């Protein structure tokens, strides 16, 4: 029963040369509930103090259907303006390309503006990782690539990524890019296992992309499983969690991190203790039998 390797203290972000923690903190809900810059600063410190240096946001975060576009970036920008030294401790990722109500715009003019606007809201000179949030079917990948390459060559962006792209969309964009993609961000969790068998992670390994997993806890379904399948997955995670003295949440993060593609789960919580807890996943060791037990539970049938 062979053990799988523990994740390294830092992962390389694709071929970019940027080193990131093997787990990230996401700020989808940072601007909710009247959170102040002081409140947000406590969360940033919680992540950094736990060794989580990879922070992921997006220009759409904060939008409530009528207002709030850019609010999460702007709130983080206030934190960085008040404590400039924090910027040197983090790898900062953001996303753009969703523009309600269109819903997507990756025209050259809009992409340039989106990057500049994010820089302004974040109050930074450079974005470490800029990602296209969702694909615009009306945008030619050649034109998109030109804008992204320009953003890198001008020093506004260090590395490039995509989110919610299909394998073919990744291949098409990467073909035209001079500065090749460093990351892909699909939904991955013990309850969302498509990418393990549909070739997405195989492509990531082939191209040297770092997969970033959004919603790694299945949108809260792992915390309160309702279906027989979800309960079976939770039970399989609990077997390892209880043996190693961690929570089911931590076991779920570590299960993703054990995959050879180097998946980086994105913590979605906006609670300091839950953010810090995520760092415990680096210490959880999986063996093949236990890892496959989770996969089999998620599939709902035995492997062939």
Curated annotation (Swiss-Prot):
Name the family.
Answer: Belongs to the aldo/keto reductase family.
- Protein purpose: Part of the alkanesulfonate monooxygenase (sulfo-ASMO) pathway, a D-sulfoquinovose degradation pathway that enables the complete utilization of all carbons within sulfoquinovose (SQ) with concomitant production of inorganic sulfite. Catalyzes the NADP-dependent reduction of 6-dehydro-D-glucose to D-glucose. Can also catalyze the reversible reaction, the formation of 6-dehydro-D-glucose from D-glucose in the presence of NADP(+).
Q: What class of enzyme is it?
A: oxidoreductase
- So where does NADP(+) get bound? 28-29, 56, 163-164, 185, 215, 217, 219, 268-270, 274
Q: Which InterPro entries match?
A: AKR (IPR020471), AKR_Detox_Biosynth (IPR050523), Aldo/ket_reductase_CS (IPR018170), NADP_OxRdtase_dom (IPR023210), NADP_OxRdtase_dom_sf (IPR036812)
Q: Which Gene3D superfamilies match?
A: NADP-dependent oxidoreductase domain (3.20.20.100)
Reaction(s) the record says it catalyses = D-glucose + NADP(+) = 6-dehydro-D-glucose + NADPH + H(+)
Q: Which GO terms describe its molecular function?
A: oxidoreductase activity
From the UniProt record, report the name of the gene that encodes this protein.
squF
Q: What is the lineage of its organism?
A: Bacteria, Pseudomonadati, Pseudomonadota, Alphaproteobacteria, Sphingomonadales
Membrane-traversing stretches: none
- Where on this chain does D-glucose bind? 61, 133-134
Annotated keywords: Carbohydrate metabolism, NADP, Oxidoreductase
Q: What is its EC number?
A: 1.1.1.432
Protein name, entry field: 6-dehydroglucose reductase
Q: Name one GO cellular component term.
A: cytosol
Q: Which residues form the active site?
A: 61
Report whether NADP shows up as a keyword of the record.
yes
